[in-house]
């Protein structure tokens, strides 16, 4: 039972946090197999190594999730979108997924365009009522590009970050303690 629960938790925090083109694959499967032939002592929730095993499974799944995104048709970049400061985990996931699935955002990634307006647009299109655009901060890499809903002057460093193969974007809503992430890629000529 623990193995099934840990597999499901790890799938939810890795494979279910990726978007290549916003479509669900009909043939993706994750299996966990154990035959018990080694005769090792059974591990349960109270076992000292239980959390270590879960973290190992999650790390393997995260690496495989990244590979799926990087292998997406025509993908040239991978982007980790982190939405933090949300009132609940459901809405933070919803916002992160909406940004990750946005074609406007994905094409901006492809063009190395630090167009934070496309990020704000994807946040707003979730229609979550309590989001206050005037309190949103956005970081591209470690550089603040939007403070309290207002765009800042973009430095040349932002353009360098946008040309990297791996990019991190943080959206801080400053409304609560919940945080979620999505891994996504750009969409360019080869995808079309």
Name the predicted role of every residue range.
Residues 2-4:
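Short, small-residue-biased leader/transition segments that mark boundaries at the very start
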């Amino acid at each position: 039972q623990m193995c099934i629960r840990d597999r499901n938790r790890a799938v939810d925090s890795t494979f279910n946090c990726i978007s290549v083109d916003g479509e669900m694959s009909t043939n993706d499967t994750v299996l966990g197999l154990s035959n018990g032939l080694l005769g090792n002592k059974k591990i349960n929730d109270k076992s000292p190594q239980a959390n270590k095993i879960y973290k190992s499974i999650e790390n393997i799944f995260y690496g495989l999730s990244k590979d799926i995104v990087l292998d997406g048709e025509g993908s040239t970049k991978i982007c980790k979108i982190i939405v933090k400061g949300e009132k609940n985990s459901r809405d933070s996931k919803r916002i992160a997924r909406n940004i990750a699935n946005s074609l406007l955002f994905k094409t901006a990634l492809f063009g190395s365009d630090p167009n934070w307006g496309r990020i704000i647009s994807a946040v707003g299109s979730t229609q979550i009522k309590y989001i206050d655009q005037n309190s949103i901060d956005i970081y591209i890499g470690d550089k603040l590009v939007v403070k309290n809903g207002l765009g800042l002057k973009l430095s040349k460093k932002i353009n360098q970050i946008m040309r990297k193969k791996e990019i991190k974007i943080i959206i801080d809503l400053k409304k609560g303690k919940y945080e979620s992430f999505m891994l996504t890629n750009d969409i360019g000529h080869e995808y079309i």
